[in-house]
Amino acid sequence: MKKILLAIAVLMTAFSVDAQTLTGREIIKKVKDNPDGETRYAKMDLVLEKANGSKRERKVESWAMDIGEDTKTMMFFTYPGDVKGTGFLTWNYDEIGKDDDKWLYMPALKKTRRISGSSSKTDYFMGTDFTYDDMGDRNVDEDDHKFLRMETIDGHECYVVESVPKDKREIYSKRISWIRKDCFMGVKVEYYDKLGKLHRALNISDIKQVQGFWTRGKMVMENVQTKHKTILTFSDLKFDLKIDGEMFNVTKLEKGL
Protein backbone atom coordinates (compact mmCIF):
# COMPACT_ATOMS: atom_id res chain seq x y z
CA MET A 1 0.00 0.00 0.00
CA LYS A 2 2.81 2.40 0.89
CA LYS A 3 4.43 1.73 -2.49
CA ILE A 4 1.15 2.47 -4.28
CA LEU A 5 0.66 5.71 -2.34
CA LEU A 6 4.25 6.69 -3.05
CA ALA A 7 3.78 6.01 -6.76
CA ILE A 8 0.62 8.14 -6.82
CA ALA A 9 2.41 10.95 -4.99
CA VAL A 10 5.28 10.83 -7.50
CA LEU A 11 2.85 10.94 -10.44
CA MET A 12 0.95 13.88 -8.95
CA THR A 13 4.20 15.74 -8.38
CA ALA A 14 5.30 15.00 -11.94
CA PHE A 15 2.04 16.38 -13.36
CA SER A 16 2.32 19.46 -11.15
CA VAL A 17 5.89 20.12 -12.26
CA ASP A 18 4.99 19.48 -15.91
CA ALA A 19 2.17 22.02 -15.74
CA GLN A 20 4.59 24.70 -14.61
CA THR A 21 7.75 23.88 -16.57
CA LEU A 22 6.73 26.35 -19.28
CA THR A 23 7.12 30.04 -18.57
CA GLY A 24 4.37 32.51 -19.41
CA ARG A 25 6.31 33.68 -22.46
CA GLU A 26 6.84 30.11 -23.68
CA ILE A 27 3.12 29.39 -23.40
CA ILE A 28 2.16 32.49 -25.39
CA LYS A 29 4.87 31.71 -27.96
CA LYS A 30 3.40 28.24 -28.47
CA VAL A 31 0.00 29.81 -29.06
CA LYS A 32 1.46 32.15 -31.67
CA ASP A 33 3.42 29.31 -33.31
CA ASN A 34 0.37 27.05 -33.66
CA PRO A 35 0.37 25.97 -37.34
CA ASP A 36 -2.46 27.49 -39.37
CA GLY A 37 -1.26 27.08 -42.94
CA GLU A 38 0.42 29.59 -45.22
CA THR A 39 -2.92 30.83 -46.54
CA ARG A 40 -6.43 30.84 -45.07
CA TYR A 41 -10.03 31.50 -46.12
CA ALA A 42 -13.17 31.76 -44.01
CA LYS A 43 -16.74 32.95 -44.03
CA MET A 44 -17.80 34.78 -40.90
CA ASP A 45 -21.19 35.55 -39.45
CA LEU A 46 -21.24 38.45 -37.00
CA VAL A 47 -24.11 39.23 -34.65
CA LEU A 48 -23.95 42.57 -32.83
CA GLU A 49 -26.10 42.45 -29.71
CA LYS A 50 -27.02 45.46 -27.58
CA ALA A 51 -27.70 45.37 -23.84
CA ASN A 52 -31.46 45.50 -24.55
CA GLY A 53 -31.23 42.33 -26.67
CA SER A 54 -31.62 43.94 -30.10
CA LYS A 55 -29.40 42.39 -32.76
CA ARG A 56 -27.82 43.23 -36.10
CA GLU A 57 -26.22 40.70 -38.43
CA ARG A 58 -23.20 41.02 -40.71
CA LYS A 59 -21.59 38.52 -43.10
CA VAL A 60 -17.94 38.64 -44.12
CA GLU A 61 -15.50 36.73 -46.33
CA SER A 62 -11.82 36.73 -45.39
CA TRP A 63 -8.52 35.77 -47.04
CA ALA A 64 -5.11 35.72 -45.36
CA MET A 65 -1.54 34.99 -46.42
CA ASP A 66 1.62 34.67 -44.34
CA ILE A 67 4.78 36.29 -45.67
CA GLY A 68 7.56 35.22 -43.35
CA GLU A 69 6.54 36.37 -39.88
CA ASP A 70 4.15 38.97 -41.32
CA THR A 71 0.54 38.45 -42.42
CA LYS A 72 -1.68 40.14 -44.99
CA THR A 73 -5.47 39.91 -44.66
CA MET A 74 -8.36 41.04 -46.84
CA MET A 75 -12.00 41.09 -45.69
CA PHE A 76 -15.18 42.04 -47.51
CA PHE A 77 -18.65 42.48 -46.06
CA THR A 78 -21.26 40.66 -48.14
CA TYR A 79 -24.41 41.33 -46.06
CA PRO A 80 -26.54 43.35 -45.40
CA GLY A 81 -26.90 45.76 -48.29
CA ASP A 82 -25.95 48.90 -46.39
CA VAL A 83 -22.43 47.57 -45.68
CA LYS A 84 -22.02 45.23 -48.66
CA GLY A 85 -18.73 45.89 -50.44
CA THR A 86 -17.08 47.44 -47.40
CA GLY A 87 -13.52 46.13 -47.33
CA PHE A 88 -10.76 45.92 -44.76
CA LEU A 89 -7.10 45.33 -45.64
CA THR A 90 -4.33 44.75 -43.09
CA TRP A 91 -0.61 44.23 -43.35
CA ASN A 92 0.33 42.88 -39.94
CA TYR A 93 4.01 43.21 -39.08
CA ASP A 94 5.72 41.08 -36.45
CA GLU A 95 8.51 43.62 -35.91
CA ILE A 96 8.23 45.34 -32.52
CA GLY A 97 7.60 49.08 -32.84
CA LYS A 98 6.41 48.89 -36.45
CA ASP A 99 2.77 49.89 -36.78
CA ASP A 100 0.57 47.63 -38.87
CA ASP A 101 -0.87 49.08 -42.08
CA LYS A 102 -4.69 49.08 -42.14
CA TRP A 103 -7.16 50.44 -44.67
CA LEU A 104 -10.97 50.53 -44.57
CA TYR A 105 -12.88 51.06 -47.83
CA MET A 106 -16.43 52.45 -47.61
CA PRO A 107 -18.23 52.02 -50.97
CA ALA A 108 -21.10 54.36 -50.08
CA LEU A 109 -18.59 57.19 -49.78
CA LYS A 110 -16.22 55.79 -52.40
CA LYS A 111 -13.52 56.53 -49.86
CA THR A 112 -10.61 54.61 -48.36
CA ARG A 113 -9.63 55.47 -44.81
CA ARG A 114 -6.20 54.61 -43.49
CA ILE A 115 -6.38 53.49 -39.86
CA SER A 116 -3.60 55.12 -37.84
CA GLY A 117 -1.64 53.40 -35.11
CA SER A 118 -3.35 55.30 -32.29
CA SER A 119 -6.93 54.99 -33.51
CA SER A 120 -6.46 51.28 -34.25
CA LYS A 121 -6.09 50.70 -30.51
CA THR A 122 -9.20 52.63 -29.46
CA ASP A 123 -11.64 52.52 -32.41
CA TYR A 124 -13.98 49.58 -32.84
CA PHE A 125 -14.18 47.69 -36.12
CA MET A 126 -17.48 48.34 -37.93
CA GLY A 127 -19.55 48.66 -34.77
CA THR A 128 -18.30 45.39 -33.28
CA ASP A 129 -16.62 44.92 -29.90
CA PHE A 130 -13.29 44.14 -31.60
CA THR A 131 -10.84 47.01 -31.99
CA TYR A 132 -8.88 47.42 -35.21
CA ASP A 133 -5.85 46.35 -33.19
CA ASP A 134 -7.59 43.08 -32.34
CA MET A 135 -7.63 42.22 -36.04
CA GLY A 136 -3.89 41.50 -35.99
CA ASP A 137 -1.38 39.59 -33.87
CA ARG A 138 0.97 41.03 -31.27
CA ASN A 139 4.64 40.16 -31.14
CA VAL A 140 5.19 37.94 -28.11
CA ASP A 141 7.83 40.31 -26.74
CA GLU A 142 5.57 43.36 -26.75
CA ASP A 143 4.34 42.12 -23.37
CA ASP A 144 5.74 40.65 -20.17
CA HIS A 145 4.07 37.28 -19.60
CA LYS A 146 3.58 35.57 -16.25
CA PHE A 147 2.22 32.07 -15.65
CA LEU A 148 -0.41 32.37 -12.90
CA ARG A 149 -1.99 28.96 -12.37
CA MET A 150 -3.78 26.01 -13.95
CA GLU A 151 -7.57 25.96 -14.33
CA THR A 152 -10.07 23.63 -15.97
CA ILE A 153 -12.56 25.03 -18.48
CA ASP A 154 -15.18 22.77 -20.08
CA GLY A 155 -13.16 19.72 -19.04
CA HIS A 156 -9.91 20.97 -20.54
CA GLU A 157 -6.85 21.79 -18.44
CA CYS A 158 -5.73 25.34 -19.16
CA TYR A 159 -2.73 27.52 -18.47
CA VAL A 160 -3.67 30.94 -17.10
CA VAL A 161 -1.22 33.65 -18.19
CA GLU A 162 -1.07 37.35 -17.39
CA SER A 163 0.32 39.64 -20.12
CA VAL A 164 1.33 43.22 -19.29
CA PRO A 165 2.24 45.62 -22.15
CA LYS A 166 5.77 46.98 -22.06
CA ASP A 167 4.60 50.13 -23.82
CA LYS A 168 2.58 52.01 -21.20
CA ARG A 169 0.76 53.92 -23.94
CA GLU A 170 -1.30 50.80 -24.62
CA ILE A 171 -4.95 51.24 -23.60
CA TYR A 172 -5.02 48.08 -21.47
CA SER A 173 -3.14 47.54 -18.23
CA LYS A 174 -3.09 43.77 -18.73
CA ARG A 175 -4.67 40.76 -20.38
CA ILE A 176 -5.33 37.42 -18.73
CA SER A 177 -5.53 34.42 -21.08
CA TRP A 178 -6.76 30.87 -20.57
CA ILE A 179 -4.96 28.50 -22.95
CA ARG A 180 -5.72 24.83 -23.44
CA LYS A 181 -2.77 22.66 -22.48
CA ASP A 182 -3.53 19.95 -25.05
CA CYS A 183 -3.52 22.15 -28.17
CA PHE A 184 -2.32 25.63 -27.08
CA MET A 185 -5.52 27.29 -28.26
CA GLY A 186 -6.90 30.20 -26.28
CA VAL A 187 -10.39 29.71 -24.85
CA LYS A 188 -10.79 32.93 -22.89
CA VAL A 189 -9.17 36.37 -22.64
CA GLU A 190 -9.94 39.18 -20.20
CA TYR A 191 -8.89 42.76 -20.97
CA TYR A 192 -8.39 45.18 -18.07
CA ASP A 193 -8.44 48.96 -18.40
CA LYS A 194 -5.92 51.39 -16.94
CA LEU A 195 -7.84 51.44 -13.65
CA GLY A 196 -7.51 47.68 -13.38
CA LYS A 197 -11.20 47.08 -14.07
CA LEU A 198 -12.39 44.37 -16.43
CA HIS A 199 -13.34 46.05 -19.72
CA ARG A 200 -13.87 43.26 -22.24
CA ALA A 201 -14.06 39.47 -22.12
CA LEU A 202 -13.48 37.14 -25.07
CA ASN A 203 -14.80 33.57 -24.95
CA ILE A 204 -13.77 31.07 -27.63
CA SER A 205 -15.52 27.76 -28.32
CA ASP A 206 -16.04 25.02 -30.90
CA ILE A 207 -12.29 24.37 -31.05
CA LYS A 208 -11.58 21.58 -33.52
CA GLN A 209 -9.21 20.44 -36.23
CA VAL A 210 -9.83 21.30 -39.88
CA GLN A 211 -7.38 19.92 -42.46
CA GLY A 212 -5.16 19.00 -39.52
CA PHE A 213 -5.06 22.57 -38.15
CA TRP A 214 -6.58 23.60 -34.82
CA THR A 215 -9.28 26.22 -35.39
CA ARG A 216 -11.81 28.31 -33.51
CA GLY A 217 -15.43 27.95 -34.56
CA LYS A 218 -16.96 30.67 -32.42
CA MET A 219 -15.82 33.81 -30.58
CA VAL A 220 -17.91 36.02 -28.31
CA MET A 221 -16.44 39.39 -27.36
CA GLU A 222 -18.38 41.28 -24.69
CA ASN A 223 -17.81 44.79 -23.42
CA VAL A 224 -18.70 44.09 -19.80
CA GLN A 225 -18.97 47.81 -19.04
CA THR A 226 -21.57 48.56 -21.75
CA LYS A 227 -23.07 45.03 -21.98
CA HIS A 228 -22.70 45.13 -25.78
CA LYS A 229 -21.40 41.94 -27.37
CA THR A 230 -20.29 40.58 -30.73
CA ILE A 231 -20.82 36.93 -31.64
CA LEU A 232 -18.51 35.74 -34.41
CA THR A 233 -19.06 32.33 -36.04
CA PHE A 234 -16.68 30.83 -38.63
CA SER A 235 -17.64 28.52 -41.49
CA ASP A 236 -16.23 27.11 -44.75
CA LEU A 237 -12.70 27.21 -43.32
CA LYS A 238 -9.93 26.40 -45.81
CA PHE A 239 -6.17 26.25 -45.35
CA ASP A 240 -3.18 26.24 -47.71
CA LEU A 241 -5.36 27.16 -50.66
CA LYS A 242 -4.02 28.96 -53.71
CA ILE A 243 -4.29 32.74 -53.24
CA ASP A 244 -2.82 35.43 -55.47
CA GLY A 245 -0.58 37.56 -53.27
CA GLU A 246 -1.35 40.55 -55.49
CA MET A 247 -4.88 40.73 -54.07
CA PHE A 248 -3.65 42.32 -50.83
CA ASN A 249 -3.47 45.91 -52.02
CA VAL A 250 -5.60 49.05 -51.91
CA THR A 251 -6.56 48.78 -55.60
CA LYS A 252 -8.16 45.38 -55.00
CA LEU A 253 -9.71 46.67 -51.78
CA GLU A 254 -11.49 49.44 -53.70
CA LYS A 255 -12.43 47.15 -56.59
CA GLY A 256 -14.15 44.64 -54.29
CA LEU A 257 -15.08 41.02 -54.88
Language-model segments: residues:
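Sec-dependent N-terminal signal peptides
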Residues: I4-T13
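Sec/Tat signal peptide C-region and signal peptidase I cleavage site
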Residues: F15-Q20
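N-terminal mature ectodomain segment of secretory-pathway/periplasmic proteins
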Residues: L22-A108
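A short, amphipathic edge element
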Residues: R25, R56, M135-F147, G196-A201
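Short amphipathic beta-strand and strand-loop transition segments with alternating hydrophobic
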Residues: S62-A64, K146-T152, S205-I207
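Gly/Pro-enriched, hydrophobic low-complexity segments
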Residues: T78, L89, D101-Y105, K111-S116, ...
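Short, solvent-exposed mixed-charge patches
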Residues: G256-L257
